[in-house]
Amino acid sequence: MVKVMRVFVILLFSNFLITESIETFYKTGELMERYTTKNGVRDGTYQKWYLNGQIGKQSNYKNGVLDGQLIIWYPNGIVKATYPITNGILEGTVKYYDENGNLSWQVYEANRPNLQNKIDLSGWC
């Protein structure tokens, strides 16, 4: 009986979750970002665009925590960087690319940056 009651309570509670799709726009009317929330917390795909309409950033959230591949693009549509993230923690190899799409810098051992590489992180989306 206790097990059945717990399942009922979980099912009842799940009906009260509020999922909302949110879009924000630049003053000029172009789409700036799109994401979903569950009970006010980001959950699902997050996307952000440059003013020119080109995708600038895409990531995934689970219960408000980054989880999955974070991708950042240059305004010309070329991938700028990829970050493998698991439950809010950077895991794996981060890759940075130049404006022509050539791999220019990576994070390797123990997910620590190679400090001999210099990269300009200003102007990221």
Regions found by a protein language model. Give the residues of each.
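Positively charged n-region of N-terminal signal peptides that target proteins for export
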Residues: 1-7
